[in-house]
C-alpha cells in the first residue's frame, strides 16, 4: 500500500514512500530520498519525476 501524504492521492508514475520501507524512501521512479527523523515524519529528496518535499501524516518506522 502506498501513501503520498494527507491528500492520499498517488502521483502518476510515482509512488512516494511506501509502508514497510524506510521513511522518505520513494518507490517507482528508482530514486530514494533523504531519511526523515524517526517519529517526526518529515522527508526531503528527489525522485525520477522531479524534486519533492513530502510530509508524513503519521509516524512509520
Swiss-Prot record:
InterPro entries: KRTAP8-1, KRTAP_type8/19/20/21/22
Tissue distribution: Expression restricted exclusively to the cortical cells of hair follicles.
GO CC field: cytosol; intermediate filament
Keywords noted in UniProt: Keratin, Repeat
Disulfide-bonded cysteines: none
Family to which the UniProt record says this protein belongs: Belongs to the KRTAP type 8 family.
The keyword Repeat belongs to this UniProt entry's keyword annotation: yes
The organism's taxonomic lineage, starting at the top: Eukaryota, Metazoa, Chordata, Craniata, Vertebrata
UniProt superkingdom: Eukaryota
11 X 2 AA repeats of G-[YCGS]: region residues: 13-49
Protein name per Swiss-Prot or TrEMBL: Keratin-associated protein 8-1
Function: In the hair cortex, hair keratin intermediate filaments are embedded in an interfilamentous matrix, consisting of hair keratin-associated proteins (KRTAP), which are essential for the formation of a rigid and resistant hair shaft through their extensive disulfide bond cross-linking with abundant cysteine residues of hair keratins. The matrix proteins include the high-sulfur and high-glycine-tyrosine keratins.
Self-association state and partner proteins as the record states: Interacts with hair keratins.
